[in-house]
Amino acid sequence: LAEVEWKGIIWKAAFGTFSYKELLTILKGYGSMEILSFEKPGHFKGMASIALNTGGTRDLTIYYLEVLGPRRAGLGRKALLELKRIFQGKIFVEDPGEILTDEYSIMESILFWIQMFREGVIDGLDSDLVRLHPGIDEKEMKKLEQTVISRMKVLRHEKSS
């Protein structure tokens, strides 16, 4: 199983195997749309696909992102900004809470992604619960956010009862 350390991050095939050359081709955005797993040891790990866009930069679709280490506050944003700097394209997020097992954690994750979208760190989110896209207005985002927060309050109350 080949892996490449590129820009301080270790990249390898998420499913199947790729040669060293194939991995570099995919990272440059010229390969097929394959899902890669990545890890910056001690900082973050995840899974994403990379595509060359018409402007010559590479867009990233993130399927999973996990911050590593005991102090994680602010590191998700930092990881996303690092990936954005490396690939210089847009970042889309697809089904980010799929691997989480409890609903409260999923809601927390969705709130994080809403905030990252609002700040312009990510350019879109497509999940079972929320869909954020360019052109969505702040009023609609606030409504989505309030729905998530309300659900979290209910879950917190149910857990404490």
Model-derived features: where do they sit?
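Non-catalytic substrate-recognition and accessory regions of acyl/acetyltransferase enzymes
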Residues: 1-71, 81-161
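Residues forming the Rossmann-fold NAD(P)(H) cofactor-binding site
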Residues: 77
